[in-house]
Curated annotation (Swiss-Prot):
HAMAP family xrefs: Acyl_carrier
Entry-linked InterPro entries: ACP, ACP-like_sf, PP-bd_ACP, Ppantetheine_attach_site
Top-level division of the source organism's lineage: Bacteria
GO biological process: lipid A biosynthetic process
Protein encoded by which gene: acpP
Keyword Glycoprotein: no
Organism of derivation: Listeria welshimeri serovar 6b (strain ATCC 35897 / DSM 20650 / CCUG 15529 / CIP 8149 / NCTC 11857 / SLCC 5334 / V8)
Name this polypeptide is given: Acyl carrier protein
Post-translational modification summary for this protein: 4'-phosphopantetheine is transferred from CoA to a specific serine of apo-ACP by AcpS. This modification is essential for activity because fatty acids are bound in thioester linkage to the sulfhydryl of the prosthetic group.
Protein task: Carrier of the growing fatty acid chain in fatty acid biosynthesis.
GO cellular component, one term: cytosol
Any Pfam family: PP-binding
PROSITE patterns (alphabetical): CARRIER, PHOSPHOPANTETHEINE
Keyword presence, Lipid metabolism: yes
Length: 77
């Protein structure tokens, strides 16, 4: 999990320009990290590329926190 979280954190920091300390498993992309819907779509696309997974629109709609993203990747990559 640590390696996945580390990579996800780097992508979020690079994409959203937030401090690494704000990226926690409980952090909401929209509420805590300031992402808008376009940011979330771009994050999902970058996660797909980085981890070699395909995230369906339905699944992407349920990825609201950093922890959701990490869990999805661990279960599907």
């Amino acid at each position: 999990m640590a390696e996945v979280l580390e990579k996800v954190t780097k992508i979020i920091v690079d994409r959203l320009g937030v401090e690494e300390s704000k990226v926690t498993l409980e952090a909401s992309f929209k509420d805590d990290l300031g992402a808008d819907s376009l940011d979330v779509v771009e994050l999902v696309m970058e996660l797909e590329d980085e981890f070699g997974v395909e995230i369906s629109d339905d699944d992407a709609a349920n990825i609201n926190t950093v922890g959701d993203a990490v869990k999805y990747i661990e279960e599907n990559a």
